[in-house]
Amino acid sequence: GYHDWQYPKEEIDKLRDPSVKAVCVINPSNPPSYELAPSVLDQLVDVVKKDNPEMMVITDDVYGTFIKGFRSLMYVLPYNTICLYSFSKYFGATGWRLAAMALPEKNIFDDKIQRLPEAEKADLHRRYSSVVLDPDKMKFIDRLVADSRLVALNHTAGLSTPQQIQMSLFAGFGQIGRASCRE
């Protein structure tokens, strides 16, 4: 039969259950690059707003740059969503594992950390006290960066590999306006 690469309504409705804590969505799909239909995005918004406002959404938007007018879950559900993006597809650097993560200033991840039991907050305080002066106010995204640096330091430090330098150039390119490219 015909495959439209959309999540069936009954599958999305399963996310209404508050015991579902997180969902990971690949949008556009990998590898055919079909984006979620507006009706599917609307249903996901409805699920979060009406039935499961505590659900964390992880969206992988790697193929988003190939879709004209692409709308990310980060756009329609910013508070609940963390967005993953890879430079590798757009710039043809597959296999290099060059990626970025985005999170809005006000987000569910920071709020969930603030609502943790005191014992868990104390563990986090100890874990990040060597990184910042006030670990209790440390943002979730900064915790991810700190943790990823620990991993990176076990491999290589700084901008020492071609991939790390290339990722910096890709990120810089994304900041250049279209008018600047024509000059």
How would you label these PLM feature ranges?
Residues 1-182:
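PLP-dependent class I/II
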